[in-house]
């Protein structure tokens, strides 16, 4: 099984565990608010601003080694469905790689792609597309 399949499987397992513990899983929806990572069009590279956001997340994860997160990668709607899903995964993988390089245990992190299925805005404009090109870190609780 390749890494992408394992990551997706891990995320599904975390989400299914959430279904059984609905009262505590509201935290699954908790996002590092104001700390989303944005990407350039059709790119998965992290810029300095994104790295600063991820440094904060890495510090928190290292201080809370019992906590797990899911990194969700997204794309704007301009590509094909397959391309956007692949790009979303590359973005999630880039975030995970940076967090791991920063000292976070890789077992704390699952990755998944949403592609362009959950847009940040309904604006079909350059500004809206910028908001769609993101990766979010969601905290999972047990």
Summary of predicted features, one role per range:
Residues 74-142:
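Periplasmic OmpA-like peptidoglycan-binding domain that tethers envelope proteins to the cell wall
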Residues 8, 41-44, 82, 99:
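Short, flexible active-site loop motifs that bind/organize anionic cofactors or intermediates
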Residues 18-68, 136, 141-142:
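Periplasmic peptidoglycan-binding/tethering modules of Gram-negative envelope proteins
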Residues 11, 30, 62, 102-104, ...:
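Generic structural signal for beta-strand residues in well-ordered domains
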Residues 49-74, 83, 92-97, 101:
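Short, contiguous, well-ordered secondary-structure segments
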Residues 1-18:
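Sec-dependent bacterial lipoprotein signal peptides
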């Amino acid at each position: 099984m390749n890494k992408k399949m394992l990551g997706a499987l891990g995320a599904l397992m975390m989400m299914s565990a959430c279904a059984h513990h609905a009262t505590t899983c509201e935290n699954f929806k908790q996002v590092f608010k104001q700390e989303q990572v944005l990407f350039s069009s059709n790119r998965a590279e992290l810029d300095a601003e994104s790295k600063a956001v991820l440094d904060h997340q890495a510090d928190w994860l290292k201080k809370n080694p019992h906590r797990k997160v899911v990194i969700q990668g997204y794309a704007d709607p301009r590509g094909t469905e397959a391309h956007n899903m692949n790009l979303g995964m590359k973005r999630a993988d880039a975030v995970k790689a940076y967090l791991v390089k920063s000292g976070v245990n890789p077992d704390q992190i699952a990755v998944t792609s949403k592609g362009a299925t959950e847009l940040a805005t309904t604006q079909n404009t350059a500004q809206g597309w910028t908001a769609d090109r993101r990766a979010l870190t969601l905290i999972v609780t047990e």
